[in-house]
């Protein structure tokens, strides 16, 4: 008598293409697939893999976090590469001169970078300037900073748990707070 083996968990799920139908993203993927294949560069392979990622895994990076990362020793004059969105941060008074390459840069962040004498590049411009990733710093936004992530973890109410409960209404009486 044979054993009914479950084969559904055997396959390792790896993205080979982006789910998005964005034509510009598809062109970047085409370019970096070619570069990764022909150059055997680790940098190009990482960029290619990050282009495949979902929006959640391509978390936005704020201008303040970007400058903090680029101020580290040995990173002066290098190109900050973000495969995602660079957003403005109004809490920051002054923005230093930066060269940023990103999939998307918000209007506020773009004006502040350019006003500081910096430069904003697209991913295809980076392929021409640094085809092997020389003089670049790969950065990414914090993935766990999403509001939804606060609800993940051990059940709220369990000792030592800081998980946020799902509450539909916040009424005067705590007992009346209905949980989803």
UniProtKB/Swiss-Prot annotation:
It is found in: Cytoplasm. SUPFAM superfamilies: Ribosomal proteins L15p and L18e (SSF52080). Residues 170-180 have a biased composition (Basic and acidic residues). It comes from the Eukaryota. One of its GO terms (cellular component) is cytosolic large ribosomal subunit. One of its GO terms (molecular function) is structural constituent of ribosome. PROSITE patterns: RIBOSOMAL_L18E (PS01106). Keywords: Cytoplasm, Ribonucleoprotein, Ribosomal protein. Pfam families: Ribosomal_L18. InterPro entries: Ribosomal_eL18, Ribosomal_eL18/eL18-A/B/_CS, Ribosomal_uL15/eL18, Ribosomal_uL15/eL18_sf. Residues 152-180 are annotated as: Disordered. Transmembrane segments: none annotated. One of its GO terms (biological process) is translation. Its main location: cytoplasm. PANTHER family: 60S RIBOSOMAL PROTEIN L18, LARGE RIBOSOMAL SUBUNIT PROTEIN EL18. Belongs to the eukaryotic ribosomal protein eL18 family. This is Large ribosomal subunit protein eL18. The lineage of its organism: Eukaryota, Metazoa, Spiralia, Lophotrochozoa, Platyhelminthes.
């Amino acid at each position: 008598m044979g054993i009914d083996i479950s084969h559904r968990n055997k396959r390792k799920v790896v993205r080979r293409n982006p789910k998005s139908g964005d034509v510009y993203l598809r062109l970047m993927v085409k370019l970096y697939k070619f570069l990764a294949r022909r150059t055997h560069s680790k940098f190009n392979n990482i960029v290619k893999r990050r282009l495949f990622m979902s929006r959640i895994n391509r978390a936005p990076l704020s201008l303040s976090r970007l400058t903090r990362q680029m101020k580290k020793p040995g990173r002066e004059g290098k190109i900050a590469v973000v495969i995602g969105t660079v957003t403005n941060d109004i809490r920051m008074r002054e923005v230093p001169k930066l060269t940023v390459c990103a999939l998307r840069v918000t209007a506020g962040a773009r004006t502040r970078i350019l006003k500081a004498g910096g430069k904003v590049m697209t991913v295809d411009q980076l392929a021409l300037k640094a085809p092997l990733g020389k003089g670049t710093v790969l950065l990414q936004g914090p993935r766990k900073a999403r509001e939804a992530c606060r609800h993940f973890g051990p059940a709220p109410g369990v000792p030592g748990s800081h998980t946020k409960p799902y509450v539909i209404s916040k009424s005067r009486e705590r007992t009346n707070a209905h949980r989803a």
